[in-house]
Amino acid sequence: MTVYHFVGIKGTGMSPLAQILHDTGYTVQGSDIEKHIFTQKALEERNIKILPFDPDNIQPGMTVIAGNAFPDTHPEIERALSEGIPVIRYHKFLGEYMDSFTNVAITGAHGKTSTTGLLAHVMQSAKPTSYLIGDGSGMGKENSEYFVFEACEYRRHFLSYHPDYAIMTNIDFDHPDYFSDIDDVFDAFQNMALQVKKAIIACGDDEHLPKIQAKVPVVYYGFNEENDFQARNVVKNTEGTTFDVFVRNTFYDTFYIPAYGNHNVLNSLAVIALCHYESIDVELIKGALTTFGGVKRRFNEKVVGAQVLIDDYAHHPTEIEVTIEAARQKYPDREIVAVFQPHTFTRTQQFLSEFADSLKKADYVYLCDIFGSARENIGKLSIEDLREKIPQAQLIAEEDTSVLKAHKDGILIFMGAGDIQKYLRAYEKVAV
């Protein structure tokens, strides 16, 4: 049997794919940078070998799965190609692998990781389900009937997939280093829609999704009356959210989620609609929704003294806004403090005013230096450009986070897609 070698095994898609193959009986190893990344914990728990990059890692009899971030000139990939060892790109491998299951792609500008995690959790309570989540979580079951996976629109990678079902949470302009404008993003989703084989579950409240053309039924969900699956009578409190679901204006059932904010109601509606389409018992759906513990880096809370520290991946103005909204629902009488690290210079430049507007919804704002991704080295702007747009915003450095102690019973939300967790960990050390 071949050994699967992952070039870039700590990637948020690569790590869960390695976990899935390992769980289903394959021999798996991989290589990556030596810096610790949160996605490696699940690999280490399975004793999956993680090696430093080295062309000598490549041996006869292997199949190389290459991460999207690594060009054909990467030393390991070069070695494999020169020795005739098969090299398959991550998204191509995944596209072929999923064909042996009833598979569901979850895509959208925002909410796809949380929705993938929620759907995997609910489906597992009904049928054997394998899943791949963009928070680095993956699980393979040998007898799986379903495969639930997160599909990213960046660089149109999701066009490698021809899923049975697609959940589309929303369309928004992001990844300005690749997409030129919202029309370019819409075009990518439109092409994806034409590749779906059974049905699309799409948010009808979204500005763009109702314009999607498809060869299969499109089932819409949302708060508005024209949706096929509609949430009504929404009751929010500090314990979570309860809502009624109407299917084409007929009462279906009442659901409770231990989650906050309208975006989590919408994510749940998407899952309810898909499960209804697959004839999963409503009592199973209701029960599983109440026990979902969330996904990594999405509103993860930790109590430190009188403060609550929240770690969240929010890195787009829309995501910042809904994260602050969720915190206000759960902690209506507490001070909300945003600690934000912008992710990539191109995104910060593109959305400078929108970032300022969304962050102003917090009571206090602290800004970390911009995190440049592997895709770019230097930008034309600095964090000062954002600070100037937010009155009273302060800059904060990893070396000195003690200023946050002033917010004695505050809700501190650390947001960003870079290494904002460094700031959170630094503050934890001085907080008590």
UniProtKB/Swiss-Prot annotation:
Catalytic reactions of this protein: UDP-N-acetyl-alpha-D-muramate + L-alanine + ATP = UDP-N-acetyl-alpha-D-muramoyl-L-alanine + ADP + phosphate + H(+)
Keyword Ribonucleoprotein: no
Gene Ontology biological process terms, A to Z: cell division; cell wall organization; peptidoglycan biosynthetic process; regulation of cell shape
Keywords (A to Z) from UniProt: ATP-binding, Cell cycle, Cell division, Cell shape, Cell wall biogenesis/degradation, Cytoplasm, Ligase, Nucleotide-binding, Peptidoglycan synthesis
InterPro entries recorded: Mur-like_cat_sf, Mur_ligase_C, Mur_ligase_C_dom_sf, Mur_ligase_cen, Mur_ligase_N, MurCDEF_pg_biosynth, UDP-N-AcMur_Ala_ligase_MurC
Highest rank taxon of the organism: Bacteria
The UniProt record lists the keyword Cell division: yes
Gene Ontology molecular-function annotations: ATP binding; UDP-N-acetylmuramate-L-alanine ligase activity
Signal sequence bounds: none
Pathway membership, UniProt: Cell wall biogenesis; peptidoglycan biosynthesis
Chief localisation class: cytoplasm
GO CC, any one term: cytoplasm
UniProt-annotated location(s): Cytoplasm
Binding residue positions for ATP: 108-114
EC number(s) reported in the record: 6.3.2.8
Protein function: Cell wall formation.
Family: Belongs to the MurCDEF family.
Descriptive protein name: UDP-N-acetylmuramate--L-alanine ligase
UniProt organism field: Bacillus pumilus (strain SAFR-032)
Organism lineage: Bacteria, Bacillati, Bacillota, Bacilli, Bacillales
Gene name, Swiss-Prot/TrEMBL: murC
